[in-house]
Amino acid sequence: MKISIGTNVKNGPWGGGNLFAKNLALFLERNHHEVFFNLDPEDLDLILITEPRKTSESSAFTHEDVDRYQKYVKSDTLVVHRINECDERKNTNFVNKYLMYANTYSDYTVFVSSWIKNLYKEQGLNVENSSVILAGADKEIFNSDGFIPWDGKSKVKIVTHHWGANW
């Protein structure tokens, strides 16, 4: 298959979406699929929208670009939209509506958590053709190598993520 991932991949630390795109591309290539980060090939089988906001530095293409591709290049290309963002995590009031509109250009939706899926469902997004795929961890980074048990006295380190409104 020829698959395009809508991310401008950055080298170095750039957030979970960037890591997701890198790891997905690696997995797909290891399984003999061709991966692109643009809409240049005229025979794409699948397009993954990861960031439809054209003002985002990580966006390789928008839902509007995908619409033009389907209208003028290849109409039977499947489109999947990965939703990893919401207003609730940053106390904004425009992201959800924008992503819900962008989602109308997709055939299928992948949410990064049940929480975010339910959030969009409650706001009116049709989640019939969707699933939740939780992020995996890079075992080269997240492992028990060098693990030191907590001594009960030192500060506890807590890691959190924006898959909830608990900020």
Name these PLM-found stretches.
Residues 1-55:
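N-terminal pre-catalytic "stem/leader" segment of glycosyltransferase-like enzymes
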Residues 47-48, 105-114, 131, 159-161, ...:
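A short beta-strand/loop micro-motif in the catalytic core of glycosyltransferases
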Residues 149-167:
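Conserved donor-binding/catalytic core segment of Leloir-type glycosyltransferases
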Residues 1, 77, 154-157:
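Nucleotide donor/acceptor-binding cores
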Residues 104-129, 137-142:
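A short, active-site helix/loop in glycosyltransferases that binds the activated sugar's phosphate group
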Residues 32, 36-105, 115:
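Extended catalytic core of nucleotide-activated donor transferases of GT-like folds
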Residues 91-93, 121, 136-155:
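Acidic anion/phosphate-binding donor-loop and adjacent secondary structure
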